Amino acid sequence: MSEEKKWVLGLKRAISFIICLIILFTYPTKLMAAQEPPEEAELFAKAAVLMDGGSGRILYSKNGSEALANASTTKILTCIIALENCDLEQIAEVSVQAAKAPKVHLGAPAGQKFRMKDLIYAMMLESFNDCAVVIAEQVAGTTEHFSKLMNDYAKKIGCKDTFFITPNGLDAQKDSQFHHTTAEDLARIMRYCIKESPKADQFLKITGEAEYTFTDVSGKYAYHCYNHNAFLKMMDGAVSGKTGFTGNAGYCYVGALEQNGKTYIVALLACGWPNNRTYKWSDTRKLMEYGLAAYERCDLDDIALDGSRFAPVPVEHAQGGRIGEQVYMKLHAVLKKDLSHVLLREG
């Protein structure tokens, strides 16, 4: 080998060695940084929450219990109530009140008829305010009755400081209350929608669609909707979400991500005003990346409830007439990667 070739080979080896050293010393630092929760000042949102979607445990909270307006993120509750309480092929007619709903709206005149399924898609993908009103009236008769239904649902879900007045999230006041929730409650509602509701699969399908086309009942008028939840294309595993904005609420967002057996939910309130439309995406990414880096899921072996065999129990008509097997529970733990905090829950 010539001296020149030896020199080139030596240079390549030296460069490779330097690159390896850089990776060796900087990667752990970056990993440790990712495992640290964001400083409150690093997030644009006034209120922000990261939740373990599996257990409902709050992993990170910035002003998570503060009552704030939440704009169109309200529609996730309107959606799940409609899915649970009506036939999607049911026909609904646009009322005079619904036709007056402000933009963003479908713009259908009073008297026009649609299938409930199509109205739900239009509400969740395009965030049409008039569609939310039609849905509320179809489910409960009036928006006032639907408001009561929403608040009853919120209480059953476990919300602690939520009071909804409008089905679309438009700012409103009633008596001494204003339309509001908290970031923690909003995450709880999303968890119900994607994990606990008997219609969770339908909710995920609707909110995960990129676009949707439909017509009114007459077939004369066609509509095409696009999903404005940009987060669905931002991170692998993003499965659902809803944006929101009003002058009082600012930009709001609630979204969910599933990856490696873990589900994370982010809820953001008052995350900037025009021209800060992208702040919510920045905050969502930071919180999701923190969750993915700092926490992991560990499956545990099946264990007997008390570690011993239960006494045989006679069962009428059972084969052999008795049951004497152990009762097992499947457990898994969502724990921080430094093993400092463990959460066990039934799987």
Which functions belong to the PLM regions below?
Residues 12-20:
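Sec-dependent signal peptide recognition
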Residues 31-201:
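Active-site-adjacent loops and short helices of periplasmic peptidoglycan-processing enzymes
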Residues 1-10:
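N-terminal secretory signal peptides that target proteins for export/translocation
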Residues 159-160, 175-347:
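Domain-terminus/edge residues, biased toward the C-terminal soluble/receptor-binding domains
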